[in-house]
A protein has these predicted regions:
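Short amphipathic alpha-helical segment within the helicase RecA-like ATPase core
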Residues: 1-229
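A generic structural signal for tightly packed, nonpolar segments enriched in small/aliphatic residues
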Residues: 166-470
Length: 470
């Protein structure tokens, strides 16, 4: 995993380069206090105080840096990110303010995925000092979780199959003293028939499995975190075009989010979170491949059966709507343990991207208070989410003539909501449940948020869990 754990350090008065922050409104006054040579240096770099503008200014025998921000008194998570990307390697401190939550973007801006580059440039780490020592460990933990998601999603499917997701869960279990259980083979077909049906056509090296991790005091409130782990999605027999398949290594982005969030929950006592919960992590890990034994349009499979779910039969009307199938079995299993809260992450529908674009995850929740808590936590962390509805009137679109339900209605309407309504059928009545339909990918880079795999909704979920269980 990418290690950037030393980028934020306590300010004990050690030597460091000053960073001044200015906005357009205060730029003229700030500029007047500088020497003619310094003003000329800024003009040569076309620095005018705009957001994300940066410059280096000579100062005696040394120099200082300056960055443009919207409001120097209210720093966002991203306002220092451009500086962290472009400044030379070294140690820095803000001249006037403490960085606050901007330490997040300072760290994530220095992420690079270079695993497959033969001539990858050496890291040039820029260290930021802060006097707010208590904020360092929580910020490190969140940044490491984001970078874990990026690493997992950016890794090609050849090296990030179901076994690799299992390996990451195994690592987490060892680090945090959790119990790990993996179901595969005949036991998977019996216990998780939808997971098996989706993944059975994959090569043996990418065989399907259900990964479960349990951690925490059984007396504490039980929560379940579920992540869609489709390590590559060809679409199955309803095959995707090549353009639609190109990014399908990211279809395990839900699992990446779930694993990263589980790490935050279990490591909370080290990062200031201290969550007192009994955690149940579930990752149905599969590859939706094409072979002679692939599931077919028109096939009918029964989901996992339990006390709260009687093994609903599902007609496969589209093999490319496979993510909701593997999540269905996982949600049934999660509810068997009677959790008070279930949260799932999935790169589930293109419809969510059409509605909200790539940067804003769609969020669905049964309870208004849970939805609002997620929205508030996202706004506080600059990790916005947007609630979409679960309209009862659309449930009839999931009806099938030959089974209890179908996995993908042909009308194409309200795709994200209908997919969430499908999942809702597999969550026990009365359980507080929320669902993230996230893109897990950034097609265009921004300061602190490079192009590629991305954690979207992760920090919102973590903030909500901290507020509720911290």
């Amino acid at each position: 995993m990418t290690d950037k754990s030393a980028l934020i350090q306590p300010d004990r008065g050690q030597a460091a380069i000053a960073v001044h922050l200015v906005n357009k409104a205060g730029f003229a006054d700030w500029l007047r206090a500088l020497s003619a040579g310094q003003r000329a240096a800024l003009a040569a770099q076309k620095f005018e105080g705009g957001s994300y503008e940066t410059a280096i200014v000579p100062d005696g025998d040394g120099w200082f840096a300056v960055g443009g921000v919207a409001d120097p008194a209210q720093l966002s998570s991203w306002c220092l990110a451009k500086l962290a990307e472009v400044l030379p390697e070294g140690r820095y401190r803000l001249a006037e303010e403490q960085p606050g939550k901007a330490i997040h973007g300072w760290q994530t801006a220095q992420y690079k995925f270079s695993r497959y580059l033969s001539d990858a440039p050496a890291d040039a780490n820029r260290v930021l000092l802060t006097k707010d020592v208590a904020a360092i460990e929580p910020a490190r933990a969140e940044a490491e979780a984001v970078m874990l998601v990026r690493d997992l999603v950016n890794t090609p499917a050849e090296d990030m199959g179901p076994a690799a997701l299992e390996a990451e869960a195994t690592r987490l279990a060892k680090v945090h003293g959790a119990h790990l259980k993996v179901t595969h083979g005949d036991a998977l077909e019996r216990g998780f028939p939808l997971v098996h049906a989706v993944g059975r056509a994959a090569a043996r090296s990418h065989a399907p499995r259900m990964i479960e991790l349990e951690w925490g005091d059984p007396a504490d409130p039980r929560i379940a975190i579920v992540g869609k782990g489709v390590c590559f999605d060809s679409g199955g027999l309803d095959i995707k075009p090549s353009s639609g398949m190109l990014l399908m290594k990211k279809d395990m982005g839900g699992a990446a989010h779930a694993l990263a969030l589980a790490g935050l929950v279990m490591g909370g006592h080290k990062s200031g979170g201290g969550l007192k919960v009994r955690l149940h992590l579930l990752v149905p890990a599969v590859e939706n491949a094409i072979a002679g034994n692939a599931m077919r349009p028109g096939d009918v499979f029964r989901a996992r059966s339990s006390e709260s779910a009687s093994g609903l039969s599902v007609e496969i009307t589209n093999t490319d709507a496979e993510g909701r199938l593997v999540l269905a079995d996982a949600l049934v299993r999660a509810c068997e343990e009677k959790p008070e809260f279930v949260l799932d992450f999935a790169t589930l529908t293109g419809a969510a991207r059409v509605a909200l674009g790539p940067d804003l995850p769609a969020m669905f929740a049964r309870r208004d208070e849970t939805a609002q808590a997620l929205i508030d936590a996202g706004l506080a962390r600059d990790d916005a989410v947007w609630r979409l509805p679960l309209p009862d009137a659309y449930r009839e679109w999931l009806k099938s003539d030959v089974a209890d339900m179908q996995n993908s209605p042909p009308n194409g309407f309200a795709g994200a909501s209908v997919a969430a309504l499908f999942l809702d059928r597999f969550v026990a009545e009365g359980v507080d449940w929320a669902h993230f339909d996230t893109f897990a990918w950034r097609p265009v880079g921004k300061p602190g948020r490079p192009r590629g795999g991305e954690a979207l909704g992760l920090r919102a979920a973590w903030g909500m869990l901290q507020a509720r269980y911290g």
